[in-house]
Amino acid sequence: MATIFDILNSINNKNNNHSNYYSCKRLKSNNNNNNNNFRNNSIKRIDIIPSMDVTITDNNIIIETELAGISKDNIEIDIKDSILTIQGEKKINNNYKQQQQQHSDKTKTNNELPLIEENKKEFRKYLSERSFGNFKRCLDLTSILYQLDLSTIKSNFENGLLIITINKKSDLSNSSFKININ
């Protein structure tokens, strides 16, 4: 049975013709008892799937992911079973609510009870188009993992753009080695 991720990936691959990579796919567990595994693992809802560009050069692979409005401390990157995973959480900025609360605290007096009630009213957003919550993006490196030197992984996060660079292993095709027979 196809999951929603399989369907989205097939649509994405048809539109972008990038069959080597996928957005995010549930990894199957090797554990035979899936019910216990389901209960023990903390499963997070994915609210955001960030945009990603992958560039392969002669010397390295460059992965650029848009993570605007996300703190560096809320981003987690790892590679497991040849899958690069970028995940974390985009939190709501509560500065406006805090400013409103500080303003209402300053205006409180004993003889102004109606004013206190007015200041306790919640504000209402006029327009809200931004997304908040958990994000996750996976990249299958299986087809090129043998070419990569994972000890050279570097990441840089600036102006909402996460750039991960992995150098390729030095080219051994031009070198010749003599192999001794024992």
Curated annotation (Swiss-Prot):
Domain sHSP residues, every copy: 43-182
CDD domains named among the record's database cross-references: ACD_sHsps-like
Superkingdom field: Eukaryota
Any coiled-coil regions, as ranges: none
Keywords: Stress response
Similarity comment: family membership: Belongs to the small heat shock protein (HSP20) family.
Protein name: Small heat shock protein hspG1
